[in-house]
């Protein structure tokens, strides 16, 4: 039995609150257990210089942790004037993941910024940011369609992310901080609603792992992805119709 009494294959409680920021074109507060991440989507009617005139959109993400997101205060990176390598890696991961399920030509010459701010960290912040960031993106696309700026959805399918790990001899789904810190093997899985893998990060922190363990961890992760996407569909309601659908604005 785990620290929080979950079974090995159990996700933590998933909570999704939409439209939590009145200024953003899309906003979601995602909670997975005690990890809480605020994700907002901002639409800019311009693209980076390398895409100008190409009738092609762009999606970019930024990620940050509030000073007291963790047990001990961590100073703001903006004050230090430099982002850590971890932050830059996570931002690139979120950006790649979201672009993988969007037809950027259909998005048009506009940029969608996804800002992910960790309010409270208890393991799995990057995976929660990907899932919450995608939902904020869907809400922003909903607004673009309702306003007539888009006539059909650029979103090809859903996407979510989850952590899996090996702690001792046990394979665990959705690790909390204590489990993550004790993990011998750490795996982050980003997967689409059709079961395609977008990103797989698997690292033997303190031990190696077998091919069978790798496949077993993937199976656990896929179960978690399905639960996250089901929760997302329930939370977004009618907006979920813009995920993987060719829709005409009427």
Curated annotation (Swiss-Prot):
Membership in a protein family: Belongs to the RNase PH family.
Quaternary structure annotation from Swiss-Prot or TrEMBL: Homohexameric ring arranged as a trimer of dimers.
Gene Ontology molecular-function annotations: 3'-5'-RNA exonuclease activity; tRNA binding; tRNA nucleotidyltransferase activity
InterPro entries to which the protein is assigned, alphabetical: ExoRNase_PH_dom1, ExoRNase_PH_dom2, ExoRNase_PH_dom2_sf, PNPase/RNase_PH_dom_sf, Ribosomal_Su5_D2-typ_SF, RNase_PH, RNase_PH_bac-type, RNase_PH_CS
Enzyme class: transferase
Function in brief: Phosphorolytic 3'-5' exoribonuclease that plays an important role in tRNA 3'-end maturation. Removes nucleotide residues following the 3'-CCA terminus of tRNAs; can also add nucleotides to the ends of RNA molecules by using nucleoside diphosphates as substrates, but this may not be physiologically important. Probably plays a role in initiation of 16S rRNA degradation (leading to ribosome degradation) during starvation.
Keywords from the named record: Nucleotidyltransferase, RNA-binding, rRNA processing, Transferase, tRNA processing, tRNA-binding
Protein name from the UniProt record: Ribonuclease PH
Coiled coil: none
HAMAP family cross-referenced by the UniProt entry: RNase_PH
Residues annotated to bind phosphate: 86, 124-126
Organism the protein comes from: Exiguobacterium sibiricum (strain DSM 17290 / CCUG 55495 / CIP 109462 / JCM 13490 / 255-15)
Enzyme Commission no: 2.7.7.56
Catalysed conversion reaction: tRNA(n+1) + phosphate = tRNA(n) + a ribonucleoside 5'-diphosphate
A GO BP annotation: rRNA processing
One Pfam match: RNase_PH
Top-level taxon of the source organism: Bacteria
């Amino acid at each position: 039995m785990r620290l929080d009494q979950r079974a090995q294959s159990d996700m933590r409680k998933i909570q999704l609150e939409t439209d939590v920021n009145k200024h953003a074109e899309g906003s979601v507060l995602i909670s997975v257990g005690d990890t809480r991440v605020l994700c907002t989507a901002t639409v800019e009617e311009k693209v980076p210089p390398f895409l100008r005139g190409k009738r092609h959109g762009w999606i970019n993400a930024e990620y940050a942790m509030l000073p007291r997101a963790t047990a001990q205060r961590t100073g703001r990176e903006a004050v230090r004037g430099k982002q850590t390598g971890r932050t830059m890696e996570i931002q690139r991961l979120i950006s790649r993941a979201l672009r993988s399920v969007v037809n950027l030509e259909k998005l048009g010459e506009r940029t969608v910024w996804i800002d992910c701010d960790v309010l409270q960290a208890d393991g799995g912040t990057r995976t929660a940011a990907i899932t919450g960031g995608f939902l904020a993106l869907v809400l922003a696309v909903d607004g673009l369609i309702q306003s007539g700026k888009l006539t059909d959805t650029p979103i090809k399918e859903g996407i979510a992310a989850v952590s899996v790990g090996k702690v001792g001899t046990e394979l665990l789904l959705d690790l909390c901080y204590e489990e993550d810190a004790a993990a011998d093997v750490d795996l982050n899985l980003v997967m689409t609603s059709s079961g395609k893998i977008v990103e797989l990060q698997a690292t033997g922190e303190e031990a190696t792992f077998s091919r069978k363990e790798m496949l077993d961890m993937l199976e656990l992760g896929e179960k978690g992805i399905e639960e996250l996407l089901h929760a997302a569909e329930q939370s977004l309601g009618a907006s979920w119709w813009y995920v993987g659908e060719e829709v005409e604005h009427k």
